[in-house]
């Protein structure tokens, strides 16, 4: 894989973006730190299929439904499955925001980066489908 300097990246930005858009990973290196540009759809697919990304679980619970993500503090309730799903998507977004702001530094939350990236790259409809067992 090619790693370009920050200056080279800036000077060749159109080419760099076209390369990533074409599905070819391209890297940028600055002060010894490396990052990679990837096509969003491919990264989203990779994260969705990752064994590190647990699947939400839904259970009927007396007066309604509960949706939760095992090994995380993310959960939601609703009168029916649709309402619980909608509340869960909101909870996912809130967790992702909290993770970016502060939880990523906590040892018991740091490992949830695949989830946070998946949530950040997903639309509301993507997340609702994922909660319901889709991709």
Segments (PLM) and residue ranges:
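Extended, non-globular alpha-helical segments
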Residues: 1, 46, 56-60
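Bateman/CBS regulatory modules and CBS-like beta-alpha motifs in cytosolic regions of diverse proteins
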Residues: 1-19
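Generic structural signal for individual residues within well-ordered alpha-helical segments
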Residues: 10, 82-85
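Short, charged, surface-exposed hinge/linker loops at domain edges
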Residues: 15-55, 86-135
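Short aromatic-glycine-(Arg/Gly/Cys) micro-motifs in beta-strand/loop hairpins
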Residues: 52-71
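A short, exposed loop/beta-hairpin motif centered on an aromatic-Gly-Thr core
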Residues: 70-82
